[in-house]
Structures are given as C-alpha cells and as structure tokens.
C-alpha cells in the first residue's frame, strides 16, 4: 500500500499534498479553515448540481421551479436550504481564513495571498449570481442595483450594463446567463484553490509565532487530518442546526415574493456577507466614488503585504497591532450592521465614520504602529 501511495503518479501527488506533507508542529485551530472551505465548496457543488437538475432559468418559471423543489422533489427542501445556508458557512470560513492570514502575517507569501484575493472575488461573484436565481423581489432588485453600479464607469458604463443585462433591463437573458456563470464558476474556484495550495506548498505553512518552523515539522496525516476532522464535525453540526431549525434566519423575507419590476421593495439589501461592502458603497454620496470605495474595500487586501513595515511577521508578540486588528474587526461588524439599516440618520453618519475608520486603520494606522513597535523592540 505504501509503495502505491509513494510511486503511483496520481497517488504520489495526493500523498505529497495531504499525507506526508511536512507541517509546523504548533499550528492552531485557526489553520483549520482551509480544509473547511474545501468542504464547503464540495457541499455547494453537490447540492447545486441536484438543484440544477430541477431548476429552470426562465423568468416565468424560475420562482415556481424553486417552490417545486421545496414542495415536490424528494428532500428538495433540505438540498435547497443546505445550498443557501452553505453559502453563509462558506463566507464565515472565508472571513475567518482571511482574518487568520492578516493576524499571523500569512500575506507575506505573495503568490498564495494574491491567488486568495482572486478566489475571494470569484466566490463573491458566484454568490451574487446565485442570489439572483430564485427570482424573488430581492433577487431582481439586488441584480438591478448591483449591475447598475457599472454604469458609473465613464464613457463605456451604460453600454457595459446593457451588455451584461442582454437588453435594456434585468430580464430573461440576464437570468439565463447568470445561471450559466453560477454553474461554471465553482469549478473555476476549485481549480484556483488547487493553484492556491500549489503556491502554499512551495513555501510551506506559516505558524502562529511567525518564525521559521523548518527545524520542527510533523507529517500532516494523522495529526492534522484528525484535527481538521473536529472542525468538519463542528461545521456540519452548525450547518445542519441552521438548516433544520431556522433555515430562513439569514435570508430575506422579500425573496418569498415573486420578482415584480413595477414594485420596488422598501429596503434593497444584499445577503449579510456583502453588507460591509454595501455600507461602504452607500457611505459615499457620489456614484462613481461609491463604486471605487466598494472595489477598494476588498482590493485593499492586495496592498497589505506592501504596507507591512513590521520586523516580525506575526502579531502574536505585537500588542499595539493586536489592538488595531480587533478595532478593525469591530469596525467590520459595525459596517455589516449599518449595511442592513435604512438610509437615514444616525445610520448614514455611523456608516461614513466606520468607512473612514476602515481605510484609516489599514492604510495609515497599521503601518505607523508597525514602525513604532520596531522602535520599541530596541528598548
């Protein structure tokens, strides 16, 4: 058996990636989220495949086909809710994974980090297009509002929006192409995840201390396979608890109303995992400025390795940076809350303040604190 594992071309590749992979001996449970993201992606692809067997991407039948899945298809309701809440779990793991990378300085592995940012954008695009498919009120108006943002691009904006729509409004052509893209993108995400792992295994994993662990490595299996299994069990228990007890907790009630182009919902908002970016978008009165702030709020991750002025990789021994980091986390929670509130005072002011703080911490306060901590090291 060992010979096959180490000699067969395909088995050898799997062996080097998941079995005999040398891993640092001190990585904590924060390193579990990579494998949990892989599990989430598998759940999404499998449940999505079964949903696609019964779904019809036509404006006249899309809403009723989702109803049919929930009412008439064997276990259709659980497949649908696993898929919808699986997306929420995906983003929870994704935010934890990125947060871990920021805290422990994993962004110094440039290729891995940059592929990760591309993955984040791809997952966000996939989730957005998936939200449009049930063709409820929030699906339709969410698609209209978000795609309309592209019209802020000078000269070519309006033409670009109509090209994406396939007409002069969000209609059948839009729904059909969104379904096609929503189906193909998870497989592209899986391929990008392989590249992400490929680059990670070039450098080896980071560890909480942020110093080289070359002198103290242990095999990935059985130590970290067992450790990951605990994360898997916790994730599945959380997901099934959500699906079986309160499947609509994270959804929007407006999406149970069929899409009506003549009736605008009182508050148009995306799914909870986009609310932080949506709050930043809304905090700027100018349309183009808002779009630039929205893109910058995520693209700013690409700047972080270049703004890293500290002499230590990890924040483990940098208390001032830790304070700023947790301020940033609190700020993101505030933005998420504001994104779900109506556009009126005091929410407008809170949103604008939180948006300024977000960019201020990442672009100015973090690099300056790093330099200060470098000075304190010499004391």
Swiss-Prot record:
GO BP annotations listed: mitochondrial electron transport, ubiquinol to cytochrome c
Binding site for heme b b566: 97, 196
Disulfide cross-links: none
Residue stretches spanning the membrane: 33-53, 77-98, 113-133, 178-198, 226-246, 288-308, 320-340, 347-367
Pfam families for this protein: Cytochrom_B_C, Cytochrome_B
Domain of life per record: Eukaryota
Keyword Lipid biosynthesis found: no
Cited PANTHER family: CYTOCHROME B (PTHR19271:SF16)
Similarity field: Belongs to the cytochrome b family.
Name assigned to this protein: Cytochrome b
